[in-house]
Amino acid sequence: MLARGLPLRSALVKACPPILSTVGEGWGHHRVGTGEGAGISTKTPRPYSEIPSPGDNGWLNLYHFWREKGSQRIHFRHIENFQKYGPIYREKLGNLESVYIIHPEDVAHLFKFEGSYPERYDIPPWLAYHRYYQKPIGVLFKKSGTWKKDRVVLNTEVMAPEAIKNFIPLLNPVSQDFVSLLHKRIKQQGSGKFVGDIKEDLFHFAFESITNVMFGERLGMLEETVNPEAQKFIDAVYKMFHTSVPLLNVPPELYRLFRTKTWRDHVAAWDTIFNKAEKYTEIFYQDLRRKTEFRNYPGILYCLLKSEKMLLEDVKANITEMLAGGVNTTSMTLQWHLYEMARSLNVQEMLREEVLNARRQAEGDISKMLQMVPLLKASIKETLRLHPISVTLQRYPESDLVLQDYLIPAKTLVQVAIYAMGRDPAFFSSPDKFDPTRWLSKDKDLIHFRNLGFGWGVRQCVGRRIAELEMTLFLIHILENFKVEMQHIGDVDTIFNLILTPDKPIFLVFRPFNQDPPQA
């Protein structure tokens, strides 16, 4: 967080006026008010070329970017640039030029121009791999009508409220097993508590959860002996993310030409992801074909196959993308949430009180409990404000639009700097503070176009509802069973590895909460 965990940001706040903390001050560029209609003016818009910029020489900019080790601190760079240039700026790195915005009203205006088939920025090394090796693609990479066709089907099976109800009995036991694992660790340590970095355990938890939802079967990732084939998949996903960053600003044509170790490792990671996902999908596909009746919900794979609204190749491609996207993202958010709770014990007690009251009122019915924990759900939003998975959201507007009195041509890459927004006092009071109650405010203007952790609109994260349910259930069981503390009082900074990760291990202390274990 700013004062405690982000020294750079703290220095910036002291050295520079807060972003938009006073309308019109500290910017040097005209800005209409921050209320309704902010960002829209009746004046003749200024040309795109006048948008503040560090310069139009993309390769020189990229040289300085690399020299300053900007790849892993790009989220801090956004903050610096907004302080320097104002609420909108453009930057060219190599061949890629983007316009960056931060104000929620500008974000709302941008999304009005996303069109029927919103387009995001495709991560170059990912796209290059799929093209070079002719891999099938799902909604992550599809565009226009083919994207829409798949997305409509997935919305029914993955996002709809009726579908989410089916996931509860699949995800809840995984969270309970994670709690059991921690209790075993406490007994093994023999000190009445467990102290450790549970990053790997959270990877296992997330993979066990997403595979259970996809296939309706457990893989045993929370057992004493972890499935080695499943571990290879998890390791490959980690390597895929980690090797993406050095390749982001390199022209894809050079990947195969120079065959650098980073590119070879990236290809090997994707190969493993596809091979393992194909293997799992085929095994469960054949198993499902042999069954005629199911006592319980059989998983997303079966429902997609049964609906016959997708070709088998498209089903496999989308399953692969959801498996790959469901490990590091959810596990990292949970790690950050535990970190924030451990540093804000008063908030942790508020959350625990809500959960325990919900358990009593719902008489143990977990489905009812999920409707009674608004503060807990708000705490997930708060974690994603401070530690968003992606540091920006991207759109290519369908037609010309005006932002901050500048004309933005159609199909310009516009990036919403959600990390910088979440850390700015103009948009969040006391932004350093972990305060879930801010999301329960009756003043909707305080949260308007600020909850962007999962994206927005029809192209928001397809796994959003699964992730929200998975994290809520996990936190319910953790709060009922343990008090979570930091082993050492100190700050943890963030680095950009395509997703935001801690710059060092986070060692947490889990102390059993003095009560009888809740009955499922």
Swiss-Prot record:
A cytochrome P450 monooxygenase that catalyzes the side-chain hydroxylation and cleavage of cholesterol to pregnenolone, the precursor of most steroid hormones. Catalyzes three sequential oxidation reactions of cholesterol, namely the hydroxylation at C22 followed with the hydroxylation at C20 to yield 20R,22R-hydroxycholesterol that is further cleaved between C20 and C22 to yield the C21-steroid pregnenolone and 4-methylpentanal. Mechanistically, uses molecular oxygen inserting one oxygen atom into a substrate and reducing the second into a water molecule. It is a peripheral membrane protein. It comes from Bos taurus (Bovine). Its EC number is 1.14.15.6. GO terms for molecular function: cholesterol monooxygenase (side-chain-cleaving) activity; heme binding; iron ion binding. Residues 1-39 form a transit peptide. The keyword Metal-binding applies. InterPro entries: CYP11_CYP27_families, Cyt_P450, Cyt_P450_CS, Cyt_P450_E_grp-I, Cyt_P450_sf. This is Cholesterol side-chain cleavage enzyme, mitochondrial. Pathway: Lipid metabolism; C21-steroid hormone metabolism; Steroid metabolism; cholesterol metabolism. PANTHER family: CHOLESTEROL SIDE-CHAIN CLEAVAGE ENZYME, MITOCHONDRIAL (PTHR24279:SF3), CYTOCHROME P450 (PTHR24279). Belongs to the cytochrome P450 family. It catalyses: 6 reduced [adrenodoxin] + cholesterol + 3 O2 + 6 H(+) = 4-methylpentanal + pregnenolone + 6 oxidized [adrenodoxin] + 4 H2O; 2 reduced [adrenodoxin] + cholesterol + O2 + 2 H(+) = (22R)-hydroxycholesterol + 2 oxidized [adrenodoxin] + H2O; (22R)-hydroxycholesterol + 2 reduced [adrenodoxin] + O2 + 2 H(+) = (20R,22R)-20,22-dihydroxycholesterol + 2 oxidized [adrenodoxin] + H2O; (20R,22R)-20,22-dihydroxycholesterol + 2 reduced [adrenodoxin] + O2 + 2 H(+) = 4-methylpentanal + pregnenolone + 2 oxidized [adrenodoxin] + 2 H2O. It is found in: Mitochondrion inner membrane. Its cofactor is heme. GO terms for biological process: C21-steroid hormone biosynthetic process; cellular response to peptide hormone stimulus; cholesterol metabolic process; cortisol metabolic process; glucocorticoid biosynthetic process; vitamin D metabolic process. One of its GO terms (cellular component) is mitochondrion. SUPFAM superfamilies: Cytochrome P450. Its main location: mitochondrion. It is an enzyme of class 1 (oxidoreductase).
